[in-house]
Amino acid sequence: RSKMSPNKKFSIKDKIELSKILEKIEIKFDQRQTLDLLDDFHKKSRGHVIGVTGPPGVGKSSMINRLISNYRKNNFSVGVLAVDPSSRRSGGALLGDRTRFDIEPGDNKVFVRSMAAKDYLGGIAELTYPYMVVMRSIFDLVIIESVGVGQSEISIEDVTDTVIYCVQPGSGDVIQFMKSGIIEIPDIICVTKNDLEELSNNTVSDLLSSKSFFTNNLEWDIKITSVSANKNQGLNSL
């Protein structure tokens, strides 16, 4: 039974313990003891889980880096699960998303775990859900970054409370957005790189004009915003 709690001061020893727990889940996932441990974490208090998804190169990692900084300034603890694609030939993965995160080495209230998607479909990894269950019992906020996705990778909706879908400026017209199945899952649509002002503004306008066609299961009024991780613009609004 883990003694970790979101109410205690999180130390480097706790980070090591958390890493060991996640490793145990990976190696011994189907064992009764591991399932009991997950049940224990599932009953604890829960942080808010945010999913960040979108096509490759849209700027998800850079935006998450800014979000982490903003949350830490407001004294929220943050856990991050960064899912990277795997090679179909070698089975390996370059776990490079975390290199975009500019995190203070001594900040024990931020924890980043990289994961390989392997052959799991849907934009996340097979162990994303159990890892999330553990981390949301410890951190105020958990951010899950999906692999770069296309039109049908929507599993991130099943493991998060809020989904942010990132859109590249000038990446397509309204019809392209409407064709995409993934446009049905976000709570927030975020146009990245808004320092490309004209392109960004046009994309935001296109999305706003077709907003009535976007729906999600909760009948939530989908928010549309824009940010620039490069210039740190729009992050407070997001």
Model-derived features: where do they sit?
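Residue-level signature of catalytic and energy-coupling elements of molecular machines
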Residues: 51, 84, 145, 182, ...
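Nucleotide-state-sensitive switch-loop elements of NTP-binding domains
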Residues: 5-50, 58, 67-152, 162-165
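Walker A/P-loop
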Residues: 61
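Conserved Switch II/interswitch segment of TRAFAC-class P-loop GTPases
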Residues: 146, 150, 158-176, 187, ...
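Canonical P-loop GTPase G-domain recognition
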Residues: 185-190, 194-237
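The Walker A (P-loop) glycine that initiates the GxxxxGKT/S ATP-binding motif of P-loop NTPases
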Residues: 54
